[in-house]
From Swiss-Prot:
GO terms for biological process: cell division; positive regulation of transcription by RNA polymerase II. Belongs to the cyclin family. Cyclin C subfamily. This is Cyclin-C1-1. One of its GO terms (cellular component) is mediator complex. The keyword Cell cycle applies. The keyword Cell cycle applies.
Length: 257
C-alpha cells in the first residue's frame, strides 16, 4: 500500500468532472446518452453490491470494486467492455487486492442464481479470468484505492459526534453510486458526508469545520451533489433502479462485448 493518499497512484489519477462526464464514442454511436451512461453505472454498482452480499465480503471490497468499475469507463467503452462482465470481474479483482479473495466459480454460481432469467448476465469462469487481464491493463495496474471510511471515523471522533457514525457511514456508501471517488480526495468526501449528517441531525459543528481550515465551498458542493443525487434518482435500497428505467438502456449494449 502507498504510504499515504497524497503520494498514491489514486491521488495522481483524480479526474475533473468533465473528464468523468464523457460518453465514449463507441457508446455514443449506439445512441447512449450521458444520462443513460450514468444509469448503467448506477445499475451495475448496485449489481456489484448485490453480488457481494451473496459472497459475503467487506464493504471495503465492494467500494474498491465499484471504484475500479467506474475508473474503467473513463478509459473504455461499454460497447467494448461489457459492464455485465466487468462488474463481477471488478469484484473478483478487488477481493484479491483487499485480501478477501472470492473464487471465480463462486461468483459465477451466484450470478447464475441471481440472473437466472437473463442470459446476458451469465458468464463462465474463463470469461472472468480473461476480463481480469483486460481490466488490469485498462487500470494501468494501479490497484490501490483510498476510501472515505477511515477518515470518516477519525473526523467524527475529532468532532465529538460519533453518535452519527452509522448515519454518515450510510451516506458514504451511497457516494459509490456516483463518481465522487474518481474526482475528490476521500477525506473531502468524508467531510461532505459529515456535513450532511450534521445538518440533517441538527448537530451544530460550524466551529469545528472552521478550525479544520478546509475549503467549505468544496465541501458544500460535494454535499449538494450527493443531495441532488438522492433527489434525482430515488433509488430503492434493496431493488436498485426500476426495471422500466434501466432495461431500455441495457438493451442498447451488445449482448457480448
Amino acid at each position: 500500500m502507498a504510504a499515504n493518499f497524497w503520494t498514491s497512484s489514486h491521488c495522481k489519477q483524480l479526474l475533473d468532472q468533465e473528464d468523468v462526464d464523457k460518453v465514449p464514442q463507441a457508446d455514443s454511436d449506439r445512441g447512449i446518452t450521458l444520462e443513460e451512461f450514468r444509469l448503467v453505472k448506477i445499475h451495475m454498482s448496485f449489481h456489484i453490491w448485490r453480488l457481494a452480499q451473496q459472497v459475503k465480503v467487506r464493504q471495503r471490497v465492494i467500494a474498491t470494486a465499484v471504484t475500479y468499475f467506474r475508473r474503467v469507463y473513463t478509459r473504455k467503452s461499454m460497447t467494448e467492455y461489457d459492464p455485465r462482465l466487468v462488474a463481477p470481474t471488478c469484484l473478483y479483482l478487488a477481493s484479491k487486492v483487499e485480501e478477501s479473495t472470492v473464487q471465480a466459480r463462486l461468483l459465477v454460481f451466484y450470478i447464475k442464481k441471481m440472473c437466472a432469467s437473463d442470459e446476458k448476465y451469465r458468464f463462465e469462469i474463463k470469461d472472468i479470468l480473461e476480463m481480469e487481464m483486460k481490466l488490469l491493463e485498462a487500470l494501468d495496474y494501479y490497484l490501490v484505492v483510498y476510501h472515505p471510511y477511515r477518515p470518516l471515523l477519525q473526523l467524527l471522533q475529532d468532532a465529538g459526534i460519533t453518535d452519527l457514525t452509522q448515519f454518515a457511514w450510510g451516506i458514504v456508501n451511497d457516494t459509490y453510486k456516483m463518481d465522487l471517488i474518481l474526482i475528490h480526495p476521500p477525506y473531502m468526501i468524508a467531510l461532505a458526508c459529515i456535513y450532511i449528517a450534521s445538518v440533517l441531525k441538527d448537530k451544530d459543528i460550524t466551529l469545528w469545520f472552521e478550525e479544520l481550515r478546509v475549503d467549505m465551498n468544496i465541501v458544500k458542493n460535494i454535499s449538494m451533489e450527493i443531495l441532488d443525487f438522492y433527489d434525482t434518482y430515488k433509488i430503492d435500497p434493496q431493488r436498485g433502479l426500476p426495471e422500466d428505467k434501466i432495461a431500455p438502456v441495457m438493451n442498447k449494449l451488445p449482448s457480448k462485448a
